[in-house]
Amino acid sequence: MGNHLTEMAPTASSFLPHFQALHVVVIGLDSAGKTSLLYRLKFKEFVQSVPTKGFNTEKIRVPLGGSRGITFQVWDVGGQEKLRPLWRSYTRRTDGLVFVVDSAETERLEEARMELHRISKASDNQGVPVLVLANKQDQPGALSAAEVEKRLAVRELAAATLTHVQGCSAVDGLGLQPGLEHLYEMILKRKKAPRSSKKRR
C-alpha cells in the first residue's frame, strides 16, 4: 500500500465531475494512525499498516441516514517530517482537511499543534473546514477530545475556519461516523456561504 509523493496532486475539480465526490486530505504526524483510520472506513475492519512513505487514496461512501450518503475521495498523506513540506500539494483547493493526532502520545501534541496551525493557515487553505480526529481513544492514558482541542489550540485558528474535534479509534471505529458527518456539514456550510453573500448584494 502507498504511492510516492509528487509535487503535483489531483484537486477537487478533477474528481467532482466524474465521481460527485468531495476531496478530503488526511494529514497528521507519523504514527498517528491515519492509514489505519482510512482502511477502517474503507473495509470496516482494523488494518495494521506500515508507515506511509507517500500517499494512499480511497473512495469512501458514508451513509447520512436512510438512503442518503456522501462520497469522499480521501487522500492519506505520509506524516514523516521530510514529507510535510509536500502536504500543501495535496491540500490545495481541497474541500476539507482531516488532521489526525495520537491522543495517547501526549509528548508530541505540541509538534502536532505547530503542524496543524501551519497547514490550516497556509494561503491555499484559508477557510477550509478542519476535522481533528483525536485517535487511539481505546488506549490507556489517551486524552479526551476536549483536552486535545485545548492542547492543539484549535480555537485559535482563523475565525473563518470551521473546526470540529472528534474522539475516535481505528481499532473499533468509534467516532468516525459522527466525525465525517460533522465534516460534511462544515463543507456544505462553506459551499453555501458564497451563494448567500451574493443573494444579499
UniProtKB/Swiss-Prot annotation:
Lipid anchor positions (N-myristoyl glycine): G2
Claim: Isomerase is one of the keywords in the record: no
PROSITE patterns according to UniProt: ARF
Chain positions recorded as GTP binding sites: 28-35, 76-80, 135-138
GO cellular component terms attached to this protein's record: cytoplasm; nucleolus; nucleus; plasma membrane
SMART domains according to UniProt: ARF, RAB, SAR
Keyword field contains Nucleus: yes
GO molecular function, one term: GTPase activity
Domain of life: Eukaryota
Main subcellular localisation: nucleus
Summary of subunit composition and partner proteins: Interacts with CYTH2; the interaction is direct and ARL4D GTP-dependent. Does not interact with ARL4D.
Family: Belongs to the small GTPase superfamily. Arf family.
Role this protein plays: Small GTP-binding protein which cycles between an inactive GDP-bound and an active GTP-bound form, and the rate of cycling is regulated by guanine nucleotide exchange factors (GEF) and GTPase-activating proteins (GAP). GTP-binding protein that does not act as an allosteric activator of the cholera toxin catalytic subunit. Recruits CYTH1, CYTH2, CYTH3 and CYTH4 to the plasma membrane in GDP-bound form.
Name of this chain's protein: ADP-ribosylation factor-like protein 4D
Lineage of the organism: Eukaryota, Metazoa, Chordata, Craniata, Vertebrata
